[in-house]
Amino acid sequence: MATTSNMFLYSLTIQPPTAVTQALLGQFSGTKEQQILTASGSRLTLLQPDPRQGKVNTLLSHDIFGIVRAIASFRLAGSHKDYIILATDSGRITIIEYLPKTNKFQRIHLETFGKSGVRRVIPGQYLAADPKGRACLISALEKNKLVYVLNRNSQAELTISSPLEAHKPGVLVLSLVALDVGYANPVFAALELDYTDADQDPTGQAREEVETQLVYYELDLGLNHVVRKWSDTVDRTSSLLFQVPGGNDGPSGVLVCGEENVTYRHSNQEAFRVPIPRRSGATEDPQRKRVIVSGVMHKLKGSAGAFFFLLQTDDGDLFKVTIDMIEDSDGNPTGEVKRLKIKYFDTIPVATSLCILKSGFLFAASEFGNHHFYQFEKLGDDDEELEFSSDDFPTDPTASYNPVYFHPRPLENLVLVESIDSMNPQVDCKVANLTGEDAPQIYSVCGNGARSTFRMLKHGLEVSEIVASELPGTPSAVWTTKLTKYDQYDAYIVLSFTNGTLVLSIGETVEEVSDSGFLTTAPTLAVQQMGEDGLIQVHPKGIRHIVQGRVNEWPAPQHRSIVAATANENQVVIALSSGEIVYFEMDSDGSLAEYDEKKEMSGTVTSLSVGQVPEGLKRSSFLAVGCDDCTVRILSLDPDSTLEMKSIQALTAAPSALSIMSMEDSFGGSTLYLHIGLHSGVYLRTVLDEVTGELTDTRQKFLGPKPTRLFQVSVQDQPCVLALSSRPWLGYTDPLTKGFMMTPLSYTELEYGWNFSSEQCLEGMVGIHANYLRIFSIEKLGDNMIQKSIPLTYTPKHLVKHPEQPYFYTIESDNNTLPPELRAKLLEQQSNGDATVLPPEDFGYPRAKGRWASCISIIDPISEEPRVLQRIDLDNNEAAVSAAIVPFASQEGESFLVVGTGKDMVLDPRQFTEGYIHVYRFHEDGRDLEFIHKTRVEEPPLALIPFQGRLLAGVGKTLRIYDLGLKQLLRKAQADVTPTLIVSLQSQGNRIIVGDLQQGITYVVYKAEGNRLIPFADDTLNRWTTCTTMVDYESVAGGDKFGNIYIVRCPERVSQETDEPGSEIHLMHARNYLHGTPNRLSLQVHFYTQDLPTSICKTSLVVGGQDVLLWSGLQGTVGVFIPFVSREDVDFFQNLENHMRAEDPPLAGRDHLIYRGYYTPVKGVIDGDLCERFSLLPNDKKQMIAGELDRSVREIERKISDIRTRSAF
C-alpha cells in the first residue's frame, strides 16, 4: 500500500482530550506549593490549585505523542522536589522533571526495556514508586515485572540502575502499590491471579478454583536482587490495593478492596475486614453489592499515626476508613492494628483519581463529566453517621454476615468550589450557526447518566460584566485616566459626545465632575496623564494641559482643526486637517514644548500611534501615521532625526486605527509590534524594528465587516490589544505557547474601549455601545473555547438538528437503570415513610439489571435560558439507538422525527427481543412532538437517514427503504449489503455509503427503475466503523474504534459506470472479489488520533474560510483536518514535520511516525500539533531548522499561525 497521497490534510486539535485517566499530587516545582499532574490521552497537564481563590489554573500542557499508561511521582531523600515517572507505549521508562523557570518538562532518563505498543506482557500497565524514592516497580498485565533502583551520584544527579527482573509466567496482575516500610528494604505489593492450571484444564473446574493472592516483592538493596517475600490468599473478588502508612506513621501493609469488603492485610499482622455499606431506599436493590473503584490516603499533621482513607464505590459514595492501633502504657500507638472502621462520608461523582491537598482541598478527576475541586468543611468525625467496625465482622471472605446499610445525603463534609469543564464521554457533535454570528458554533452531547449534558462550544474568551449603565446620550469615545503618575487606580472616566465631553469620577459611586479642568463644551480626541501630575485633553480646536488645577491651552492654527491625536506620558502628537503633523514633548519643568517643524503628509491623516515610553528612556522612538491613501508611515521621534520617515507600508484599505505596542514573543523576550486596523475590517500585525523602523513579518486576520479600532489594554499583567469591529476581539500572547492569539470576546458589540482600574476591579476594561457604558473584565487567557451546558436526563446516543428551526433532538438511554414508571411504583409501595428521592445528578439513578431507561428530548439552545422543551419517555423496556429527521414525499415533503429502538437489549453478548421504528410529527415549529405510530423490525435499527423522500434504515446487515403509511412504515426495497451490522449511513443522489461495524465502508447504488439496492465497492481493510461523512461524491471520511481517521475514494471509472443508465444488470451479475463486492476503494488518507472518533462532518469554522473536516472524540477531543491548497505548502510542512521529529522527539521516547501510524502507516496527513511545537523550541534549534528550510524563523511561525487562523480556531 503506497504511503504517499495526492490528497494532503493538516491535522489540528481544537480542544484537547479532557478524560483524565490518572492524577497525582506532588511538589514538582521544588517549592512547598503542591501541583496536580493529570494524564489525558497523550497529554500531561500540570495544574496549580489556588487555595485563596478556590480555583485550579493550568500551568503547562504537554503532548507526549504516545499513550500514557501510568504515572507515578517520587522524591529522593533530602530533596524538596518530586520527579515524575512515565510508563507509556514506547517500551521505555521515562523520568522527567518540571522546570518552573522555563515552564517545561525536561527528560532526565529514558531506559528501554521492551517492545513498543500496549501489550499485555510488556511492562507499563502498573507503576509504583517507593515512598522514600529509592526504587520503582513497573509491571505488565501478565508475567513481567521490572524493578529500577533510583539514586543520586556524586554530582547530586539522579541515576537509575539496570532493571532487576521479577517475572513469573502464568500470572495476571490486578493491582500494584509500594509499601511504606520506612528505610527498610523497599517492598511492593501486588494482587495476582495464577491462571496456569485453569489454562490447561479443559473441564473448566480449575477456573472455578482460581485464587487471588496478595504477593510481596522485596528489593534487597545489599544484594541488588528482587525476591518474592510473602504471599497469601485473599478474597477472590479483590481488585484494588491501597498503601497503609508505615514507619512512625502507621502499621504499614495494605488495604485490599473486593466486592463489598475492605480488608487490612500485612505479613506480620492479623487480617481485619469491614463490609462496604449498601444504600438503603425505596428504589434501591437491597441485594446489590458495591465495589471500591478509587480512593486516597491522607496523613494528618501533628501526631504520629493520624491518617485516614477516603474510598469511593461505583455509586460515587465516599467512605472514610480509619485504622485503630493498640496503644502502649503512655498512650502512643504501637504499630499493631486493633481494628478497622468504616463510615459514610459524602457522595461525589465517580472519580478515576482523588487527590487531597495539604491546604484542605480535594481534587476529583471524574470518570465521566466535569472534574471537581472541593474544600473540606470538616472530616466527618463528629457527625451522626453509623460507624462499622471489623470487631463485628469475620475476616474469612467466605463466611456469612449481615449486610450493613446507610442513607445517602447531600454534601456535608465537602463543599464544591470549582467545576472544571470536561466533555468526556463525547457521543455526538454538530456544527451550526444558530446565533447569527460571524462564525458557527459547535453543539455536542456528552456525559453519562443523569450528569449528561448538551453543550454549546463557541470560540472566544469568557467575559465577566461588572457594570452596564445607560447614558443620557450616545458617546463616541471613552477614556479613563489617573490624576498622577503614582496613582494605583483610575480617577476619571471621560466620555466624548458630538457636542461636548462628560467627566465622571470613579469611586464608591460614579458622579459627574465639574472642576476637572477639562473643556466640556467640545468633543475630545485624546486623554492622557502626563508627567508627574498633569493631564492632557486633545479636542478639535486645541490641546488643554491641566497641571495642579492650572490650565494651559495650545490653540490649533486658524482655519484648521485637529483630526487625530496620540499621546503617552511624555509625548503628544496631533494631526491637523491640512495633513500636517505637530509634535510635542514634555520639558523637564513639566510644560509641553512644540517641535519647531511640522511634517506634512500627502493625504488626510486617519490615525496616529506613539508607543509607550520604554523603561529607562525619555521618549518613544517611533510614530506611526495612517493616511487615507492606504499607507502607514513610520516617523522617527529621536532628537537627531525628528519626524523623518523611516519606512512605509502599503495597505489594501485605509487604516482606521494604529497601535504601537511591545509584547512578549516566542523568542523568550519582547518585540515591538505595530497593530493596524483597516476600514475593511481587516486586522494586521507587523513587527517594527526597534533600530531601523522597518516593518516586517505582517500577519492579517479578518475580524468583521465594520472598520477595526484598536486599543492597548492590560489583562493578567500583560499588554494586549483590544480590537473592535462587528464584535470585540482580544490580541494577546498565549500563556503556555507564547504565540500571538487573536480571539473574539463573548460579549456585545463595542464601539470604543479603554483600560479600567479601580478598587473593585483591579484589571478591567471600559467600553461603549450605543448609549450604554459597560465595565467588564477577562478572567482567563488560556482557554479560548467557551462552553455552556444544558442538563440531559440519560446518556445521550445521538443528536439531530431540525432542518429549519434552531432546535436539537437527542435520544438518550441508560442500561441497568430503573425506568421512571418502575421508580414511581416502588415509591408508592413504600409504607415506612422512607420515600426520599435524592437528586439523580448527584446520586445517580437506581440500578436494575436488564432494565433500560430511555427518552427523547427537544432542546432549545439559543433562548435566553437554554433548556429542554419536552421530554418523551420510552416504555416497554425499549432503548433508543438511532434517530433522523425525514421529509416524506408522500406527505408533501413534511418532515417527521424517526427514532429507532431496541427492546430488552443486552450489550455483551449482543441480544434483543425485537426492534421498532417510531415516527413523530412536529408541532409548534418543532417545539412539540406527536407520536404517530411504530413499526416492528427484526433487529434494533442502528442507522437511519432520509433518502429521496423516504426513509433509509440499516436493520442488522440489511439495508431497507421505507415509506410512511397510515398505521406503520411500508417496506419498499431491501438488500443484504454488509457482512456484520450496519452502523452508519450517508447518501448523495442515488449513491449510499454504508458503514459496517467490522468490515468498513461499502458503496451501494439505488437503481429506481428496478427498485434495487446494489453494493458495488468496499474497503480493503476490515475497519470497525464508528462514524462517516461524504467529502465529495467519490470520497468518504470515517473513523474507527481504534482511533483512526481515514478517507477512502471510489475509482473514477467504477463511479461513472455505476451511474450510467441501464447498468443495473451489469452490476448485479458482476463477479465478486474475495468474498466482497466486485470493486475496491482506494485509501487516500490515514491518521491515528488516539481518541475514538464519534462524529465527523465537513464544515467551515471561520468567516470566509475553506471547508474542513471537523471530528469529535469520545474523550472530549475536537479536531480538524484542513486541506492544503498548494503543493508548495505541502512540501514546506512535510519538511518542517521531519525536522520537528528529529529536533523535538516525543518526551516519553515514542517514535512520532510510528505513533501516528499505529495500525496503518500514516498517509496524506501532516501533524499540525507537532508543527505548532516549533514556537516552543530553543532559539538555536529554531535558527537551525529555519536555515535548513531556507526561511526565517518569523516566516515559519507566520505560516504555522496562518494555517490555523484561516481555517480553525
From Swiss-Prot:
What's any one GO cellular component for it?
U2 snRNP
Q: Keywords of this protein's UniProt record, alphabetized?
A: mRNA processing, mRNA splicing, Nucleus, Spliceosome
Q: Which residues cross the membrane?
A: none
Localization recorded for this chain is: Nucleus
Output the GO biological process annotations, alphabetical, semicolon-separated. mRNA splicing, via spliceosome
The molecular function terms of the Gene Ontology recorded here are: U2 snRNA binding
Relate the protein's function as given in its record.
Involved in pre-mRNA splicing and cell cycle control.
Family, according to the entry, reads as follows: Belongs to the RSE1 family.
In terms of PANTHER family, this protein maps to: DNA REPAIR/RNA PROCESSING CPSF FAMILY (PTHR10644)
According to the record's subunit comment, the protein's assembly and interactions are: Associated with the spliceosome.
Q: What is this protein called?
A: Pre-mRNA-splicing factor rse1
Question: Which organism does this record belong to?
Answer: Neurospora crassa (strain ATCC 24698 / 74-OR23-1A / CBS 708.71 / DSM 1257 / FGSC 987)
**Mind giving the lineage of the organism this protein is from?**
Eukaryota, Fungi, Dikarya, Ascomycota, Pezizomycotina
